[in-house]
């Protein structure tokens, strides 16, 4: 059975919890999983810290932040493994329109390593074969086989030369206006594009609103006395270039203990300015014997999160620093202003 990108019914969104509720819940869950050894009245401490989150880590009075129930734009698309052709069979059918093997391999590797495991990816047969070879399950692939197919129902579309020729101006103008990663150049270029389920006008409006919210949130983090920011990282916060999941996680983490932001990273090659930075290097402000235990507590806090705040990966890189990275694509509307 083949799937041709039929739009699936929209899922009803749950009511959006307030920012104080989000912070309080985050901290409550973490302290429930990590009780303070040798201290009585732990429950009282949880309540006190969660309440302090509203004043100490909220991203500023007058700016109300809310979590949007981020659901995938489509249900997972099922297809038996046999529905995805082998790389050898696909090569002949795509011919000169196919991207070079090296570019296709680089794009497949990035998607396998950076894209959320829940994301459905639309692709031409050759690209789908490369993605399957890199470990993506067939249930995550929407194969664009015919001229009647469209990428709606997926979260991302891999725009090879074949896909660009198939959809023409509709690819950017109707289905997928934003490039979140790009590989190669010229006719063989491969772009990874985010699908706009509600249309390109609504998507572009959401991107603009999201940047405004990220600027506001980042500015408030810069004013947070429990967060130290390296000079090179300050601009990313003030210009709205940081992923909202990082912004919210850092605000919650700062309530638990002071934190230093050493820098933000961009693991998305060729991404446009609309794509925020999804990774950060963090350090503890505690020194001496307390430094490493403090860092491990930070890592435990990060790893205890639930979606959409559970990162793609997080690890210690030394006794004084850790890295955290979120998956692509980042959610829009995770921060909302008044």
Task: Tell me the role of every PLM-derived stretch.
Residues 1-47:
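Terminal targeting segments of Actinobacterial cell-envelope proteins
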Residues 45-69:
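Secretory targeting and sorting signals
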Residues 60-88:
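C-terminal region of N-terminal signal peptides and the immediate post-cleavage residues
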Residues 79-103:
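Glycine-rich phosphate-binding "P-loop"
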Residues 115-120, 152-154:
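Loop/turn elements at helix/coil->beta-strand transitions in domains of secreted/extracellular proteins
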Residues 124-129, 161-165:
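Short, polar loop motifs at secondary-structure junctions
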Residues 125-154:
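Extracytoplasmic
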Residues 154-338:
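Aromatic/acidic, Gly/Pro-rich catalytic loop(s) in extracytoplasmic/lumenal soluble domains
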